[in-house]
Amino acid sequence: YCSVDLRNAGFKLAPVDTNLFPGAFNNLPQETLPLAVQAAMASIEKICPDAKNLLVIPERHTRNAFYLENVARLATIMRQAGLNVRFGTLDENVAGPVTIALSDGQKLVIEPLERSQRRLGLKNFDPCSILLNNDMSGGIPPVLENLHEQYLLPPLHAAWAVRRKSTHFSCYDDVAKKFAKLVEIDPWMINPYFAHVEGVDFQARTGEEALADAIDG
């Protein structure tokens, strides 16, 4: 469950960004949907074989038509994989179900979350798994913390508020080296160059010279 930006230089192919909260399922061609459903079924079998109810938590900007089409396509894939899918919102201003009509005639129903001591769900809906399609760039909402009885995907430490791209690339560097050794290729062929620069703050305009030096070097 992610999207990856690839750069093809002709002589090497490497990922330059990975989004763990993908927002373009509506870009999948119709003929690829059976493959997407198959992949979803395989993941469900691996992570939670008994899963029946899935709670999807999307971004709060629920009037973005392109994003809503993405969410609808994601729900279609999961439903065809055998799950009951409903949508919950982190927007505390939503007090009851909100129905949103899409351009293709579909309708999405967004509902307020209900939190018990150890579980998160909706009114009359107790999910065994929760799928985040919200990057949490503004921080981790308390309502998502300390859920010990449900699968939360991706995990909270993957939120944009705490995740660091330098850590991601460092981990990918290890994976690329192991994979390259397995298939007997130079890891450079699939690994982008990256460097870690401390003290960069674009709002405060600090660390920009150090960043430029790292790029030039």
Language-model region placement:
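Conserved N-proximal alpha/beta basic substrate-recognition cap immediately N-terminal to
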Residues: 38-39, 62-216
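Short glycine-rich phosphate-binding loop at a beta-alpha junction
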Residues: 53-58, 129-131
